[in-house]
Amino acid sequence: MTTKRKPYIRSMAPNWWQKLGFYRFYILRESTAVTTMWFSILLIYGLFALKGGTQSWHEFVTFLQNPVILLVNIITLLGALLHTKTWFELAPKAANIVIKGEKMGSGPVIKLLWAVTIIVTMIILGIALL
C-alpha cells in the first residue's frame, strides 16, 4: 500500500552559512578556489605572452602593473596563504606519527611544513633572480 503523504522537508534560509563562524570560515576557505583559478588563467596568459615574443611579453608586464590587477593578485596571494595554512593544519590530523611510543603533536609537523615551504620558495626565487 502506498501513501500520498509528503515527507517533511525542513526549510533552509539562503544565509544559513552566516550564522556560525565555522561555516563562514569554511565558505571563505573554499572560495580560495576562485583565486586559484585566477592565478591559473594569469599563468597561462603569461606563458602565451612569453611564447609570443618581446612585444607580447611587454604587454603582459604592462597588464600586471595595472593597479586593479595588483590588488587582485594581492588577494590571490592572501587566498593561497590561507589555503596553505589550513592544509598544513590538516596534515598532522591525517598522519599519525609515533616516535618512541608517543604520538607526535601537530606543532612540529606544521612548523616543518612551513619551513620546507619557505626554503623551497627562497630557492626558486634565488634561481629566478640569477
Curated annotation (Swiss-Prot):
Q: Which residues cross the membrane?
A: 33-53, 60-80, 109-129
Q: Which superkingdom, per the lineage?
A: Bacteria
Where is it localised?
Cell inner membrane
Asked if the Swiss-Prot or TrEMBL record annotates the protein with the keyword Transmembrane helix, the reply is yes
Q: How does it sit in the membrane?
A: Multi-pass membrane protein
Work out whether the entry's keyword set contains DNA repair: no
Using the UniProt record, give the first listed, main subcellular location: membrane
Family classification: Belongs to the FrdC family.
- Purpose of the protein: Two distinct, membrane-bound, FAD-containing enzymes are responsible for the catalysis of fumarate and succinate interconversion; fumarate reductase is used in anaerobic growth, and succinate dehydrogenase is used in aerobic growth. Anchors the catalytic components of the fumarate reductase complex to the cell inner membrane, binds quinones.
Self-association and partners: Part of an enzyme complex containing four subunits: a flavoprotein (FrdA), an iron-sulfur protein (FrdB), and two hydrophobic anchor proteins (FrdC and FrdD).
Q: What is this protein called?
A: Fumarate reductase subunit C
Please name the source species. Photorhabdus laumondii subsp. laumondii (strain DSM 15139 / CIP 105565 / TT01)
